[in-house]
Amino acid sequence: MNPKFIALLGSTGSIGRSTLSLVRQFPDRFKIHSLSCRRSIDKLVDQIKEFSPKQVVVEASDQVTQLRELFAESELEILSGDQGNCQLVQHPEVDLVVTGIVGSAGLSPCLKALEYGKDLVFGNKESLVLAGELFMQVAHRSGSLILPM
């Protein structure tokens, strides 16, 4: 069985850390393709070193600069903001998107993931409360699954 490649939004929060713990327990079933965080750059750096993702997303351009300096010798793609999150969830190698982003900030990348036929695991219910009907319609059209964590 081939492992599922995960795009993890909110990797440094509690949902993200729980997801990474699961990936550690089942390395033959899951691999991290991409990570995303808002502010906790130090935690993200540790996660990059451990999981070797192909892409990461941070919130601000100064954080992008900091990561590019730290990982100058790697092929890591470093993106920023909501647009970066939307870009990484649609990557062809991503099988599963796990989101721990709270509130409305996760709406755009979650919707984009569903549009691209990615299965989506919600670690929070805010996005479903805010746009659940729309998510269900898009998932039905694309064949995506929406799963609770």
What are these regions (language model features)?
Residues E59-A60, G123-K125:
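Short beta->alpha connector loops at strand-helix junctions that form conserved
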